[in-house]
């Protein structure tokens, strides 16, 4: 730890156990001890080795207020915390560790983080879970009738805020609520039903820890930070991305550009991609030459031929009995 962090300028301290009990009946001494160990000792390990000039930015959680008995809205950063379960208690302890450390810190108390992710989306977060169920035409159970109030925040805005705090040298040794939406569970379910009317909403009397609360975001907005993403559009995206897709199972598929616009200046041809681009390469080949290429089963590659013509020969090398396929690909 010392080797990595001793001369670091900024630390985004995200480490922690996130598979945590949501209600008392889910808790156990073994789980609680693991959550506490990783949170408290892990954080202290970082604080012990970073320099005074290093800025540490740590996500805390709205759950530090889970012990509030009555519905309360617009909770400020300086209100007394009331954690109950191990996760909230560990984050509450982390906040005190940073405040007492004498180091340059920023604490962001996150609402429930929602939004589509290309890698490991947190399905245990209510808006994400509801969107996943809605994408499969499932039933959304509304515990306590869905009356609980939730403070939510978009995933991409959380990432943007971490970068914002990293770059703002004038913000230090401070804590901010990072929430955007205050809604009920039922309102989230109704948005899901708007984008997939096939789902069923079922109200139940199951246990809930409380009827909810919300955090004020006035302080974070006063820094100049702006939220750019919306709950309804995020839910629509998650339902769409997680719904059944008519996927092309061919090893390779050739498709011409679409939505063409042609005039005297030339032609515009469009190719719509369904996923983020993480790399772009340019290949130039001379006439009569040969190139070899490979990609792994979990990858997708998309190639746009802008000039000339190629003859392709390809095969699934994981399957020795697969056929060798030959095809001609033209520009565009």
Q: What is the role of each PLM region?
A:
Residues 96-150, 155-159, 164:
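NAD(P)-dependent short-chain dehydrogenase/reductase
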Residues 317-332:
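Short acidic-glycine-tyrosine-enriched beta hairpin
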Residues 247-277, 292:
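A short, N-terminal "cap"/entry segment at the start of jelly-roll beta-barrel domains
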Residues 1-38:
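NAD(P)H-binding glycine-rich loop region in Rossmannoid oxidoreductase-like domains
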Residues 30-45, 81, 85, 89-90:
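Glycine-rich NAD(P)-binding loop of the Rossmann-fold in SDR/ketoreductase-type enzymes
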Residues 298-317:
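Glycine- and acidic-residue-biased ligand/ion/polar-headgroup-sensing regions
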Residues 138, 143-256:
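C-terminal substrate-binding subdomain of Rossmann-fold SDR/epimerase-dehydratase oxidoreductases
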Residues 13, 44-84:
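Conserved Rossmann-fold NAD(P)-dependent oxidoreductase catalytic core, especially the SDR/UDP-sugar
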């Amino acid at each position: 730890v010392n080797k990595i962090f001793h001369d670091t300028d900024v630390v985004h301290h995200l480490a922690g156990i996130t598979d945590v009990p949501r209600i008392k009946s889910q808790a156990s001494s073994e789980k609680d001890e693991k959550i506490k160990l990783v949170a408290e000792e892990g954080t202290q390990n970082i604080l012990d080795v970073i320099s005074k000039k290093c800025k540490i930015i740590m996500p805390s959680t709205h759950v530090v207020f889970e012990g509030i008995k009555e519905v309360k809205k617009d909770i400020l950063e300086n209100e007394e915390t009331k954690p109950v379960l191990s996760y909230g208690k560990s984050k509450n302890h982390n906040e005190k560790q940073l405040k007492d450390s004498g180091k340059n810190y920023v604490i962001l108390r996150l609402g429930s983080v929602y939004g589509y992710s290309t890698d490991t989306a947190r399905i245990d977060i209510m808006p994400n879970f509801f969107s996943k169920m809605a994408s499969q035409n499932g039933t959304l159970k509304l515990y306590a009738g869905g009356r609980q109030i939730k403070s939510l925040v978009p995933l991409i805005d959380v990432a943007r805020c971490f970068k914002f705090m990293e770059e703002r040298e004038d913000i230090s040794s401070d804590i901010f609520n990072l929430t955007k939406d205050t809604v009920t569970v039922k309102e989230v379910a109704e948005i899901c039903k708007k984008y997939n009317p096939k789902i069923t909403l079922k109200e139940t009397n199951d246990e809930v820890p409380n009827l909810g609360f919300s955090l004020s975001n006035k302080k974070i907005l006063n820094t100049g930070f702006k939220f750019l993403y919306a709950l309804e559009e995020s839910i629509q995206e998650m339902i769409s991305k997680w719904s059944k897709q008519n996927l092309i199972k061919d090893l390779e598929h050739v498709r011409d550009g679409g939505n063409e616009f042609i005039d005297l200046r030339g032609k515009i041809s469009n190719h719509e991609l369904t996923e983020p681009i993480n790399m772009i390469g340019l290949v130039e080949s001379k006439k009569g030459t040969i190139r070899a290429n490979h990609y792994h089963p979990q990858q997708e590659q998309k190639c746009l031929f802008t000039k000339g013509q190629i003859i392709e020969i390809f095969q699934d090398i994981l399957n020795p009995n697969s056929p060798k396929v030959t095809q001609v690909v033209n520009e565009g």
